[in-house]
């Protein structure tokens, strides 16, 4: 049935056929995610509501914005993308998130939490001003409903004088279980129909509708039609209680573990997050001032043990990255030593607070930045390739990049007594242990991983930041040594400050910089400027990502395609040394 499905015909389906359609959606989503990886549990829980949306509304004339996008797989399958769904999250394939360039059914690109209500308001005002006739819908989970941007948008609802439908898909989870006072209000309504809480929501200018079982198709069809009818008179909040992982027993029992699922058979590398969790627990055992803050991602960031062992010093503030940054700054002002663990792509949401609250006050906050660099299959909205650039411009902030998981341990030890803002950034997986000098970390001090003994008129040094770039450097070194050529490899573990002693002392005539970051404002440009100001006369060649948003795909392939191409770098090194 799903293979031949057409949105135009769904209104002719019987209830029995619609239930079969729901079953087929779940099977297709499960099979595809097992093969390609992706977000499983959230999508399994949103099947009935999505079928009801297609049955009641008229897409693509009506517009829907999926907040984050973790619930959009059923929508993609019902909007003409079944045949290509097997390419989910692959290079050139179907995106795991809504994408306007992919289909006319996708009204607005998403990937980060809290944007859907604002986006729906904007589309609704465009409709009103152009005199168009269409419904505009924001589909948002209870985890995202904690985000402050949602309440900025709700505060604008009456001012903008427009009509939207907000579907609140309440499964009690973001990645982790949903936390916070706002969720307590939502949960009171779900559990007991608390009238005072309903009035609070309606004070924004919304008519409230509740659905006890959002995975009951009959109930969803009726509620969706009622919401559509009410929408003619003003904005509506349709609150549906669903089960994350619905229809797959293991996922229902383990919603956090099946939130994001790798392809079956994927190699299991040790993750930096595991080392972060172990390291922070060890530090906290010795230092009672150490605290940890997470924005709704404690499991993914390796913090479960810390939250278990030190609950009084562990704080999950929900999807509220700005609040988390100010909380850390003020904890530091009160004499604590806060660590804020967060994905690179989400840290950029708190840019102002990093400047204004943490760094301008020179607070000893440590940012533990996971998924830095190209993240791969989640595409443009999740690549962590900007942090070196936007953090490098901030005074008082030190930026460190460990070469491997063991150096992350050493950097955490260093951070415990560091009295200034510090950012430590690293990718997801740690595959290699490089060895090295095994000395205590010193601010701004780099490390030779290999020092050439060759004497020649031309001497080259590769300055590489982080594990991925050092892997490339060491691979090229091996190939060059097999051809009788040699060069220095430097673990540039501090991006800010640079190792000015190295820059002063090096006898290299050619410098190559490698970074898992965009070129603009990044490590390479800083190195080029430093050598120019030192009047060294070196030729500096930068390898970083060009000025484009990087789509989904494999990490190594994307590195090569967008500016850190191992073959190209090797050819340049050989041309210098030959």
Question: Model-predicted segments: where are they?
Answer:
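Glycine/charged-rich beta-loop-alpha catalytic/anionic-binding loops adjacent to active sites
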Residues: 27-34, 95-109, 132-137, 305-317, ...
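Active-site nucleophile and cofactor-binding loops and adjacent substrate-binding regions
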Residues: 37-46, 66-70, 98-117, 140-144, ...
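Peripheral docking tails and interdomain loops at the edges
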Residues: 268, 376-378, 397-398, 525-578
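Glycine-rich ThDP/TPP pyrophosphate-binding loop and its adjacent helix/strand module
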Residues: 106-265, 269, 273-274, 278, ...
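Cofactor-/ligand-binding subdomain signature composed of acidic, glycine-rich
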Residues: 1-32, 200, 250-264, 575
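Non-catalytic terminal/interface segments that mediate subunit docking, oligomerization
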Residues: 244, 248-347, 353-363, 466
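A glycine-rich helix N-cap at a beta->alpha junction
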Residues: 84-94, 159-171, 359-371
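Cofactor-binding active-site loop characterized by glycine-rich and histidine/acidic residues
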Residues: 21-22, 39-160, 290, 295, ...
């Amino acid at each position: 049935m799903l293979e031949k499905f057409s949105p135009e015909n769904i209104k002719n389906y019987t209830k029995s056929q619609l239930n079969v359609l729901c079953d087929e959606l779940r099977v297709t989503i499960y099979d595809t995610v097992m093969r390609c990886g992706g977000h499983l549990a959230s999508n399994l829980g949103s099947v009935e509501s999505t079928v009801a949306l297609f049955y009641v509304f008229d897409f693509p004339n009506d517009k829907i914005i999926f907040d984050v996008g973790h619930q959009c797989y059923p929508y993609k399958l019902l909007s003409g993308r079944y045949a290509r769904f097997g390419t989910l999250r692959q290079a050139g394939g179907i995106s795991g998130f809504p994408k306007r360039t992919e289909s006319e059914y996708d009204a607005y690109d998403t990937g980060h939490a809290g944007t859907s209500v604002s986006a729906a308001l904007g589309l609704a005002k465009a409709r009103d001003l152009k005199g168009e006739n269409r419904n505009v819908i924001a589909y948002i989970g209870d985890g995202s409903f904690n985000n402050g941007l949602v309440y900025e948008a709700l505060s604008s609802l009456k001012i903008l004088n427009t009509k939207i439908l907000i579907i609140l898909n309440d499964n009690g989870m973001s990645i982790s279980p949903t936390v916070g006072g706002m969720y307590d209000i939502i949960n009171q309504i779900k559990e007991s129909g608390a009238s005072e809480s309903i009035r609070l929501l309606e004070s924004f200018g919304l008519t409230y509708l509740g659905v006890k079982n959002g995975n009951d198709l009959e109930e969803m069809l009726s509620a969706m039609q009622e919401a559509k009818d009410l929408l003619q008179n003003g904005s509506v909040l349709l609150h549906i209680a669903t089960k994350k992982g619905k229809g797959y027993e293991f996922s229902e029992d383990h919603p956090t573990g099946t939130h994001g699922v790798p392809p079956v058979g994927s190699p299991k590398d040790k993750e930096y997050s595991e080392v972060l969790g172990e390291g922070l627990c060890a530090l906290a055992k010795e230092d009672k001032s150490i605290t940890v803050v997470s924005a709704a991602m404690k499991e993914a960031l390796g913090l479960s043990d810390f939250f278990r062992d030190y609950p009084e010093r562990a704080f999950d503030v929900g999807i509220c990255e700005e609040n988390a940054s100010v909380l850390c700054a003020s904890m530091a002002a009160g004499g604590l030593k806060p660590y804020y663990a967060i994905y690179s792509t989400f840290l950029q949401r708190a840019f102002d607070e990093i400047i204004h609250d943490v760094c301008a006050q020179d607070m000893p906050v440590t940012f533990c930045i996971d998924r830095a660099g190209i993240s791969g299959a989640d595409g443009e909205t999740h690549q962590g390739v900007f942090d070196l650039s936007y953090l490098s411009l901030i005074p008082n902030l030190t930026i460190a990049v460990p070469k491997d998981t063991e150096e992350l341990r050493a950097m955490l030890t260093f951070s415990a007594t560091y009295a200034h803002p510090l950012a430590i950034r690293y990718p997801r997986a740690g595959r290699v242990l490089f060895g090295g000098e095994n000395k205590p970390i010193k601010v701004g001090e780099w490390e030779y991983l290999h020092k050439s003994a060759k004497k020649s008129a031309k001497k080259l040094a590769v300055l590489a930041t982080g594990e991925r770039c050092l892997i490339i450097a060491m691979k090229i070194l091996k190939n060059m040594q097999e051809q009788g050529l040699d060069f220095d490899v430097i673990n540039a573990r501090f991006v800010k400050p640079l190792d000015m002693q190295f820059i002063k002392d090096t006898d290299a005539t050619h410098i190559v910089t490698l970074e898992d970051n965009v070129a603009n404002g990044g490590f390479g440009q800083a190195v080029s400027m430093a050598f120019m100001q030192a009047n060294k006369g070196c030729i500096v060649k930068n390898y970083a990502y060009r000025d484009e948003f990087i789509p989904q795909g494999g990490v190594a392939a994307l590195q090569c395609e967008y500016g850190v191409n191992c073959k190209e770098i090797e050819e340049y090194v050989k041309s210098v040394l030959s």
